[in-house]
Amino acid sequence: MPRLFVMLPAYNEERCLPPLLRAFQKLFAELPASYDPLIVIVDDGSQDRTARVARNAKKKGFPVELVKHERNKGLGEAIKTGLNRCLDHAEGPDDVIVCMDADNTHPPRHVVEMLETLRVEDADIVIASRYRWGSRQHGVPVHRQLMSLG
């Protein structure tokens, strides 16, 4: 059975992770039974209780693995660490890795569309972007949208 890895680089996301994990729990219940899901949370030296949230989710039986950086190394290193951990667990060519922000600004429901695109297009990679022409950002405060412009 192919694995579905959801890799979440996280820095001080104790408030955002619980609703995001609940959304993934709902999504996993709706996924075809052909995927074995695992969420890999990379806590990039958070100063809050991000790691505790991940550990508690695992204790409740949720498919979560926590990887912790002792100090903040930045988003790039968190992504690299997370991808390497997913690859350590990969079992075959049909495994899928989804990388999303842990701040709950990307609705997990889009994962289903991405999986369908992989299947229909026989693609190796699908990139979803809120910056694509005609796309919109939902749930992101205006000041954060402006900061993203550079």
Model-derived regions: residue spans:
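Alpha-helix termini
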Residues: L27-Y35, A57-G61, R85-D94
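Acceptor/aglycone-binding surface of glycosyltransferases and processive sugar-polymer synthases
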Residues: H69-D88, D94-C99, T105-G150
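Short beta-strand/loop segment that forms part of the nucleotide-sugar
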Residues: L8, P32-S46, V67-K68
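Short, well-formed alpha-helical segments that are part of the catalytic scaffolds
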Residues: E13-E30
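Residue-level preference for short helical/loop micro-motifs built around acidic side chains
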Residues: R15-P19, D48-R52, K73, E77
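Extreme N-terminal starter segment of soluble prokaryotic enzymes
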Residues: M1-F5
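A conserved acidic beta->alpha catalytic loop
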Residues: D43-A51, N104
